[in-house]
Amino acid sequence: MRSFLYMLSQRPKLACLCGKSIIIWPGKRTNLPENAFTQRMLQECGQMAKPDASVDLDNFKAISEQSPAEFGIDSCRVKAQPEDRSDRIREQIASAYPVIHERTLLLFISFLEHKLTFGSEQEKAIYKDMTVVDLVQRLLAKRCVWFFGANDYYRTMQGNIGNEGFEAVGTPAEKEPLTLTSVLSYDEIKLSALLYVSCHSEFINNGSRVNGGEVLQNKDTIEREGVVIGLIGARFERPDVMEYQDIMITKTQNTEANGYGFDLEQISSETVTPASDLRRIWREFYEEPRDFIYADTPYDTTRFEEVSQGIFDHQVMRKRYAISFDTLLLEAQDRAFKAGKPAYIHVVGIGLGVWKAARQQERTFLESFEGRLRALGERLSHIGVVHFSWFHLACVGSLHDGAIIPVDKHPQGGIRIRNSVRNPGDKLTEDMLPVVTYAWDGNALPGNEFWANMLISTGDPAAACSTLISELQNPHINVHYMNGANLHIASVEHGLLHVGDYARRLIV
């Protein structure tokens, strides 16, 4: 059961950033296991092919009309767009897919193996014979319509509305309507937070937080279309679940009974427990040799910060960000390369709003982003500008408005940095591909609060009101493209590949 992610990982390298030693992670290669379960999972991935279904726009609209989730407005739907945009919209529909980091693919495999061995009866029944592609499809399709707030206010796809109860999903204590057959468990939502969605889309307006779906008649002040990527930050609103398990160190959570405090060498087949094995797969995902009992946490102010709940681990937070940033940068690079023009990436602070849990979290975000820009280097030949919008810190490391991050062989010598307030759809002054990000959620459809008719609230509904993502990135509407079989993998070594192409490169 000992995972390849730890055993075969390369020794982490260090870089100096802001006077601190920052681990360069992940490395350029993710080594693969040779165990039979992983090889079988990759073999099954290798059988997948890109969808070749042609886009029938009338059928797409008909499926949307049957959606069990009600649209608050129609201006952001395909049916409301001008007829002369139909050909472009067909291309945008076909451009949609889910995307994960290559390390996340291997994490999903470890998760399935763990649950088949240590899962509850409910979990074993669900995961029996499940492939990675099946798991991704489940993470897309079984999420709620909306899911937000510290009390987990939700509406399921079946129309049930309520608060709380997700901690029991997948256990003998689960109750209708929150059962594993209908919704995701918190262990799955944690995985789902590493699963992102991407597509080209129309821009209806400038995408401001208060756009409310207004149809801008004068298109001269906005970009007509661009790439829209839903990223998900670390969520700390509920204790003892999600990234809280990996990044928060508390008296009640970080105990041996909950699987914490063990070195890998301490655990054997005789001493392993479901809790310690679940901690193992996450430690190995982040390539951390151990996680900490609260009382044994080392004194290291460059890594740890005291917060109201306990201790916040910035090293693991930085790694969590790195997975998101690698995926964003490699996805934007591929989209821009295919478009034949440099990408202008609009970056928002995922997890830095109501989910923010530490004073230094924004600094860690920006440090991690700079680290990944430098680490990916020559892979980012088609990244022209990275624009940080609505950040409080004007300068962290080399990231400040007007900076250039040097990149060998880059057509412009490097990647330009902007740090100022702008709207995602604002007109660019150069011929570049707009790539805009929005802060999504691991247990909601794209738009989240949008579906609760809260159109003017956060970046999630703002993105849904200003683009076509509520349909194009919706697995219940864009059924031929936004599905597990169309999963794409962002690889530091190989670039952006369909899961079938990626797996065929790796199969032993």
Curated annotation (Swiss-Prot):
GO molecular function list: ADP-ribosylarginine hydrolase activity
InterPro entries: MavL-like
Domain of life of the organism encoding this protein: Eukaryota
Amino-acid positions noted as binding ADP-D-ribose in the UniProt annotation, renumbered to this chain: 209, 349, 351, 353-355, 390, 441, 448-449, 459-460
Keywords: Hydrolase
EC numbers on record: 3.2.2.19
Entry keyword annotation includes Hydrolase: yes
Pfam family, one: MavL-like
UniProt catalytic activity: N(omega)-(ADP-D-ribosyl)-L-arginyl-[protein] + H2O = ADP-D-ribose + L-arginyl-[protein]; N(omega)-(ADP-D-ribosyl)-L-arginine + H2O = ADP-D-ribose + L-arginine
Function, as annotated: Protein ADP-ribosyl hydrolase that specifically removes mono-ADP-ribosyl modifications from protein arginine residues.
Protein name: ADP-ribosylarginine hydrolase CG3568
